[in-house]
Regions:
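Sparse recognition of residues in long alpha-helices and their boundaries
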Residues: 61-62, 107, 144
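Short, charge-rich amphipathic interface segments used for partner binding and complex assembly
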Residues: 112-138
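Motif-centric detector for short Cys/His coordination patterns
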Residues: 1-86, 99-102, 126-129, 133-136
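Long amphipathic alpha-helical coiled-coil segments
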Residues: 110, 137-148
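Alpha-helical interaction segments
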Residues: 40, 50, 110-111, 120-121
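Short E/K-rich amphipathic alpha-helical oligomerization segments
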Residues: 94-117
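Polytopic transmembrane helical bundles with strong interfacial aromatic enrichment
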Residues: 90-97, 138
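Generic N-terminal initiation segments characterized by hydrophobic and/or small/turn-forming residues
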Residues: 65-66, 95, 143
Length: 148
């Protein structure tokens, strides 16, 4: 079988199975535990469903907690400007993360010991800054609106 990765943007809030049945106006089936933890899930088209907590939390993360993951929607866009935006945002997120790590390293606040010499990370950051600069020039020439 072919493997798939599901990518969809949803809204959700915690809700027990019993509360979901009440919300829908349904009688709770005798073989279901109304105390089961889960989530009320609302899809883009307005469809609503309930998902058990474990299943939901394995499949979804809070968008604001993983900004890199949110760029996937632009990565698969047919519009090259949206794909460009994804490329730019991914690079910027990674650069800012590496920069924060190096700042913590300099302050003696890292909770791990890096395996590469500091100069390697400095070189990587310099390359990332150069790459970002080239992309920013393209933004100007290609009239791309970065919706950061």
């Amino acid at each position: 079988m072919q493997k798939y990765i599901g990518v969809k943007r949803i809204e959700a809030r915690p809700m027990t199975r019993g509360d979901y049945n009440t919300y829908r106006g349904w009688q709770i089936p005798a073989d279901e535990n109304p105390a089961d933890e889960g989530y009320l899930v609302k899809y883009r088209d307005g469809y609503e469903s309930w998902s058990p907590k474990e299943v939901f939390e394995e499949a979804y993360v809070v968008e604001d907690d993983f900004p890199l993951l949110a760029t996937v929607f632009n990565m698969k866009s047919p519009d090259y400007k949206r794909r460009f935006e994804a490329e730019y945002c991914q690079l910027k997120i990674r650069y800012e993360g590496l920069k924060r790590m190096c700042e913590k390293w300099d302050a003696g606040e890292l909770d791990f010991t890096p395996t590469c010499p500091r100069a390697t990370y400095d070189k990587q950051m310099a390359a990332m800054v150069d790459y970002l600069s080239v992309l920013e020039v393209r933004v100007h020439y290609e009239d791309i609106d970065l919706q950061e």
